[in-house]
Amino acid sequence: GALGNKYFRYYDIDLAEAITCSGQLSIRWIAKHMNEFLNKIVGTEDYDYVVASDTDSIYLRLEKVVDKFCANKTKEEKINYLDKVSREIIQPFMKKKYDELAEMMNAYENKMVMEREVIADKGIWTAKKRYILQVHDSEGVRYAKPKLKIMGIETTRSSTPQVVRDKLKECISLILTTDED
Protein backbone atom coordinates (compact mmCIF):
# COMPACT_ATOMS: atom_id res chain seq x y z
CA GLY A 1 0.00 0.00 0.00
CA ALA A 2 2.05 2.90 1.30
CA LEU A 3 5.28 1.86 -0.44
CA GLY A 4 3.45 2.08 -3.78
CA ASN A 5 2.28 5.66 -3.13
CA LYS A 6 4.64 8.07 -4.91
CA TYR A 7 4.04 10.70 -2.21
CA PHE A 8 5.14 8.34 0.59
CA ARG A 9 8.53 9.16 2.08
CA TYR A 10 9.86 5.64 1.48
CA TYR A 11 8.22 5.12 -1.91
CA ASP A 12 9.68 2.12 -3.73
CA ILE A 13 7.62 0.54 -6.47
CA ASP A 14 9.86 -2.54 -6.60
CA LEU A 15 9.37 -3.25 -2.90
CA ALA A 16 5.63 -2.58 -3.18
CA GLU A 17 5.38 -5.06 -6.05
CA ALA A 18 7.48 -7.64 -4.18
CA ILE A 19 5.20 -7.40 -1.13
CA THR A 20 2.08 -7.76 -3.29
CA CYS A 21 3.50 -10.75 -5.17
CA SER A 22 4.61 -12.52 -1.99
CA GLY A 23 1.15 -12.02 -0.48
CA GLN A 24 -0.49 -13.42 -3.60
CA LEU A 25 1.88 -16.38 -3.58
CA SER A 26 1.15 -17.23 0.05
CA ILE A 27 -2.64 -17.08 -0.38
CA ARG A 28 -2.62 -19.06 -3.64
CA TRP A 29 -0.24 -21.59 -2.04
CA ILE A 30 -2.51 -22.27 0.92
CA ALA A 31 -5.68 -22.30 -1.22
CA LYS A 32 -4.16 -24.89 -3.57
CA HIS A 33 -2.98 -27.10 -0.71
CA MET A 34 -6.24 -26.77 1.27
CA ASN A 35 -8.23 -27.85 -1.79
CA GLU A 36 -5.94 -30.84 -2.38
CA PHE A 37 -6.05 -31.81 1.31
CA LEU A 38 -9.83 -31.53 1.68
CA ASN A 39 -10.49 -33.34 -1.62
CA LYS A 40 -8.33 -36.20 -0.34
CA ILE A 41 -9.99 -36.30 3.11
CA VAL A 42 -13.56 -36.13 1.81
CA GLY A 43 -12.98 -38.27 -1.27
CA THR A 44 -14.03 -35.60 -3.75
CA GLU A 45 -12.22 -34.73 -6.94
CA ASP A 46 -11.37 -31.18 -8.01
CA TYR A 47 -14.00 -29.71 -5.67
CA ASP A 48 -13.18 -26.11 -4.74
CA TYR A 49 -13.42 -25.79 -0.96
CA VAL A 50 -11.97 -22.27 -0.97
CA VAL A 51 -14.91 -19.93 -1.55
CA ALA A 52 -12.91 -16.71 -1.38
CA SER A 53 -9.56 -15.36 -0.31
CA ASP A 54 -8.24 -12.03 0.84
CA THR A 55 -4.84 -10.58 1.66
CA ASP A 56 -4.43 -12.66 4.80
CA SER A 57 -7.35 -15.09 4.86
CA ILE A 58 -9.23 -17.80 3.06
CA TYR A 59 -12.87 -18.77 3.41
CA LEU A 60 -13.63 -22.48 3.31
CA ARG A 61 -16.93 -24.15 2.59
CA LEU A 62 -17.01 -27.35 4.56
CA GLU A 63 -20.53 -28.68 4.00
CA LYS A 64 -19.14 -31.79 2.29
CA VAL A 65 -16.91 -32.42 5.33
CA VAL A 66 -19.93 -32.04 7.63
CA ASP A 67 -22.10 -34.24 5.38
CA LYS A 68 -19.48 -36.99 5.38
CA PHE A 69 -18.43 -36.99 9.02
CA CYS A 70 -21.42 -35.75 11.03
CA ALA A 71 -24.51 -35.95 8.87
CA ASN A 72 -26.93 -36.99 11.61
CA LYS A 73 -25.69 -34.56 14.26
CA THR A 74 -27.38 -31.50 15.71
CA LYS A 75 -26.35 -28.03 14.59
CA GLU A 76 -24.48 -27.55 17.90
CA GLU A 77 -22.59 -30.84 17.43
CA LYS A 78 -21.66 -29.81 13.87
CA ILE A 79 -20.33 -26.47 15.11
CA ASN A 80 -18.31 -28.24 17.82
CA TYR A 81 -16.98 -30.66 15.20
CA LEU A 82 -15.92 -27.85 12.84
CA ASP A 83 -14.24 -26.00 15.71
CA LYS A 84 -12.30 -29.12 16.68
CA VAL A 85 -11.34 -29.96 13.07
CA SER A 86 -10.16 -26.40 12.58
CA ARG A 87 -7.97 -26.43 15.71
CA GLU A 88 -6.63 -29.96 15.47
CA ILE A 89 -6.40 -30.64 11.73
CA ILE A 90 -6.77 -27.59 9.48
CA GLN A 91 -4.62 -25.10 11.39
CA PRO A 92 -1.72 -27.55 11.91
CA PHE A 93 -1.94 -28.47 8.21
CA MET A 94 -1.75 -24.79 7.24
CA LYS A 95 1.24 -24.26 9.53
CA LYS A 96 3.02 -27.23 7.96
CA LYS A 97 2.34 -25.94 4.44
CA TYR A 98 3.47 -22.41 5.30
CA ASP A 99 6.64 -23.85 6.87
CA GLU A 100 7.25 -25.66 3.55
CA LEU A 101 6.69 -22.42 1.63
CA ALA A 102 9.10 -20.55 3.90
CA GLU A 103 11.71 -23.27 3.35
CA MET A 104 11.15 -23.21 -0.41
CA MET A 105 11.46 -19.40 -0.52
CA ASN A 106 14.56 -19.50 1.71
CA ALA A 107 12.89 -17.29 4.32
CA TYR A 108 14.57 -16.72 7.66
CA GLU A 109 11.42 -17.95 9.38
CA ASN A 110 7.76 -18.57 8.65
CA LYS A 111 5.72 -15.49 9.57
CA MET A 112 2.44 -16.75 8.08
CA VAL A 113 -0.10 -17.84 10.68
CA MET A 114 -3.78 -18.46 10.02
CA GLU A 115 -6.38 -19.24 12.65
CA ARG A 116 -10.09 -19.84 12.38
CA GLU A 117 -12.12 -16.71 12.79
CA VAL A 118 -15.75 -17.72 12.31
CA ILE A 119 -18.01 -20.70 11.75
CA ALA A 120 -20.91 -19.65 9.57
CA ASP A 121 -23.60 -21.67 7.84
CA LYS A 122 -24.57 -19.13 5.18
CA GLY A 123 -22.73 -16.43 3.31
CA ILE A 124 -23.05 -14.05 0.40
CA TRP A 125 -20.09 -12.52 -1.45
CA THR A 126 -20.85 -9.58 -3.73
CA ALA A 127 -17.24 -8.63 -4.54
CA LYS A 128 -13.77 -8.64 -3.05
CA LYS A 129 -13.91 -7.49 0.61
CA ARG A 130 -17.73 -7.29 0.41
CA TYR A 131 -19.56 -10.14 2.09
CA ILE A 132 -22.17 -11.17 4.64
CA LEU A 133 -21.92 -14.22 6.90
CA GLN A 134 -24.41 -15.76 9.31
CA VAL A 135 -22.02 -16.55 12.17
CA HIS A 136 -22.59 -19.19 14.87
CA ASP A 137 -19.13 -18.96 16.45
CA SER A 138 -16.62 -16.14 16.26
CA GLU A 139 -13.13 -16.91 17.58
CA GLY A 140 -14.55 -19.29 20.18
CA VAL A 141 -17.52 -17.12 21.19
CA ARG A 142 -20.66 -19.15 20.55
CA TYR A 143 -23.95 -17.40 19.76
CA ALA A 144 -27.30 -18.84 20.80
CA LYS A 145 -28.81 -16.92 17.88
CA PRO A 146 -26.54 -16.45 14.84
CA LYS A 147 -25.11 -12.96 14.30
CA LEU A 148 -24.51 -11.27 10.98
CA LYS A 149 -20.96 -10.35 10.03
CA ILE A 150 -21.19 -7.69 7.35
CA MET A 151 -18.08 -6.40 5.61
CA GLY A 152 -17.96 -3.67 2.97
CA ILE A 153 -21.72 -3.68 2.36
CA GLU A 154 -23.67 -0.40 2.51
CA THR A 155 -25.01 -1.32 5.97
CA THR A 156 -21.56 -0.62 7.42
CA ARG A 157 -20.81 2.62 5.58
CA SER A 158 -21.32 5.91 7.39
CA SER A 159 -22.18 7.57 4.06
CA THR A 160 -25.33 5.42 3.87
CA PRO A 161 -28.28 7.01 5.74
CA GLN A 162 -29.09 5.23 9.03
CA VAL A 163 -32.67 4.42 7.99
CA VAL A 164 -31.35 2.73 4.82
CA ARG A 165 -28.70 0.82 6.80
CA ASP A 166 -31.35 -0.45 9.22
CA LYS A 167 -33.65 -1.61 6.41
CA LEU A 168 -30.77 -3.26 4.55
CA LYS A 169 -29.82 -5.17 7.72
CA GLU A 170 -33.43 -6.33 8.08
CA CYS A 171 -33.47 -7.51 4.45
CA ILE A 172 -30.13 -9.30 4.78
CA SER A 173 -31.26 -10.99 7.98
CA LEU A 174 -34.49 -12.08 6.29
CA ILE A 175 -32.57 -13.52 3.32
CA LEU A 176 -30.14 -15.48 5.50
CA THR A 177 -32.50 -16.70 8.22
CA THR A 178 -35.57 -17.80 6.29
CA ASP A 179 -36.31 -20.47 3.72
CA GLU A 180 -38.12 -19.96 0.45
CA ASP A 181 -41.38 -21.14 2.01
Regions inferred by a protein language model and the residue ranges of each:
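Metal-dependent catalytic core segments for phosphate chemistry
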Residues: G1-N5, Y10, F69-A71
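Amphipathic alpha-helical interaction surfaces
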Residues: A2, H33-E36, K128
